[in-house]
């Protein structure tokens, strides 16, 4: 990880993640497509559940980032014993997180949905979907711990294969369970939730089989099952900011849903569809960041500061290219993108307007997301969190409130663009200040 040329090394680490995450995004698109065929109420319910579903993912993925960073840094420093300790205690805590999230979210989802709609059918559909999906929270947490472990040691192929098989199973099961094809009963939105859960079970089997069969660069060890203050504190110091980074999307979505609901339920649906599309458009960039993060952590642990900065700059360039392609898609075929999830002409038209406005912030968003990923890889969780706070809370929510008073729902879409511009400037400042003490950036 500290000797190979930067570009092929980053590609070898990122490409499997880009492929697997692209397929995962495709699943989310397909899942939403089939749910939209049930009814517009079902799609609205899915959109309203999304913030809580995203929060559960944020806890699992964000804490996994802490596990990933510690393993990579300890291996880079030649401390295999500490890497094993971080992995073992990280898994114990991940299981605890999954249990707590499952219980709290299942209990709280009916009350959450009533904050945004009084439609009894939408609430019933949302509760039905969420109860099933949230029941798989422990499985999700264990899955993501294995995923981050494999990423930390550079074993991207296992991660790719596991995600691919799980996502393909989801895509196959979705229409069969939703609409009652073949031997399956017609379960509607509950079928979509079950397909998601079943798809999450398969990767665990693959991860365990690979772990037992392959030579272990890092391993679970019984003597490390007892939680220690040092490791737990370190895991949370990296993991909590990463969790908050991702959970802020839920805060933002919830706030924007409340603002848009005052105009029309249609705009809530448009926002939900946009986030489905955004997931697909941003996934290649996120895949590259997934590949960059352990490389930066490993080279940081090995004292290769120059390579850390080279990895950051190359990742930023690649992500700018990806975001440019996303902007072009939203400008050229917005109607087709929205039409995949909505049949109402007014909903599609409102969505086209939203995409035309929001997409101009895509390119600048590459600066913020790349800086966050690099700082997380370095174990600098607080600076990364500050960047995310600017994007998801501090700027966009007040701007959306103000702009919506003057421009209606369109003001919310304009708030996205202004926020990405200001956040990009802030991200550059935070990143450079954070790494200056480490002498990553060479004097010009």
Stretches with model-predicted labels:
Residues 17, 21, 33, 69, ...:
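Transmembrane alpha-helix boundary and packing residues in multipass membrane permease domains
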Residues 1-14, 71-138, 184-240, 296-361, ...:
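Short alpha-helical transmembrane segments in multi-pass integral membrane proteins
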Residues 55-58, 170-175, 204-208, 280-283, ...:
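Hydrophobic transmembrane alpha-helices of multi-pass small-molecule transporters
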Residues 22, 26-44, 113-120, 176-187, ...:
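Helix-terminus/linker motif at the lipid-water interface of multi-pass membrane proteins
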Residues 64, 68, 133-151, 159-167, ...:
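Short runs within selected transmembrane alpha-helices of multi-pass transporters and secretion channels
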Residues 12-31, 132, 166, 199-203, ...:
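Transmembrane helical elements of multi-pass membrane transporters/channels
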Residues 43-103, 140-159, 257, 270-328, ...:
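Small-residue-rich hydrophobic transmembrane alpha-helices
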